[in-house]
Amino acid sequence: MIVVYTSPGCASCRKVKNWLKENNLKFLEKNIFQIQLNQSEIKHLLMRSENGTDDIISKRSKIIQENNIDVEEMSITELVDFIQHNPSVLKRPIVLNEKTFLVGYDEEEIGAFIPADRREKVITRL
């Protein structure tokens, strides 16, 4: 199952959701401001990201800038707690399934969410 972490008013989030719908891919949307992410979800996001916090945390977010926060100095427990209470620091959208992890909307990379058997059919038709 594809999970999409979104926020209201996010243009890239809308692009991802529209692309998934156009390609008839089922997904579960989680608005990070409507539901509080649990600790295991946050740890899972951190584990799945290739570059740790750099991939999923916006260092330019208001709370990080105004408070001069260095997430690299935090323990995992502190980081998870920080994200849980400040979801606005997460880059959006975050899209993942069992095999693929994507932050943001990238027209080429998002194709990885199409199952291999369907990708082969598309390529064969070309």
Locations of the language-model features?
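Local sequence-structure signature of Cys/Sec-based thiol-disulfide redox active-site neighborhoods
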Residues: M1-N23, F27-I32
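Thiol/selenol-based redox catalytic cores and closely related redox-interacting motifs
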Residues: Q34-L126
